Amino acid sequence: MLFRSPTMVESWVEPALIMIVFALALVAGSTQLSTMVGFMTSPAVGLRVSLGLALVALVIVAIAENARVPVDNPATHLELTMVHEAMVLEYSGRHLALLELASWLKLLVYVSLIACVFTPWGIAHIRQNPGALAVGVLAYVCKLAGAGVSLAVFETTIAKMRVFRVPDFVGVALLLAFLAVLLRFVSASL
């Protein structure tokens, strides 16, 4: 079935991810990640609707891309409802461990991207003293813990959607990212 393929979900997610990066680049004035984070720490950022829409779209993309509960249930035993887990059914041992590690690392990258771009507080610079770096690492760990708790609460309070509804779910992310870009073009302050 074509809808169960993880690559199919990734192909739905990619246009939304490109629009999110485009919206962030328009707001920050650059496509460099360090410049985006630097802009987000500046007082000029303020409250912007386009950044809120981009954040919600990126969270939807992260959920779909990592095959979390509304899109896929990692703990299911029904092969017909699996998206990501159907791919790893035939693996065991170290090969399964490597696939699970890759899945965890992808989730870590998305959570780190959301935490460092949208909540850049506590980020230490290279030239600062070791105490500031320790505070930066502590802030990063706290952001990851907060994201983990938020993900756990979200997954326990929402039910898995049908496989045929996944394109609509990802389409919402694309629509929100497009609205973020459109709002940025319409008004410089949004």
What label would you give each PLM region?
Residues M1-L2:
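Short, small-residue-biased leader/transition segments that mark boundaries at the very start
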Residues V21-G52:
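Juxtamembrane/interfacial segments at transmembrane-helix boundaries in multi-pass membrane proteins
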Residues A44-E65, L133-G136:
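Alpha-helical transmembrane segments
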Residues V56-V71, A145-T156:
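Transmembrane alpha-helical segments that form the membrane-embedded catalytic/substrate-channel core
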Residues N73-H95:
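Juxtamembrane inter-helical linkers in multi-pass membrane proteins
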Residues S92-R127, Y140-A152:
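Alpha-helical transmembrane segments of helical membrane proteins, especially in multi-pass transport
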Residues L151-L176:
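Interfacial loop-to-transmembrane junctions
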Residues A180-L190:
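Juxtamembrane boundary at the C-terminal end of a transmembrane helix
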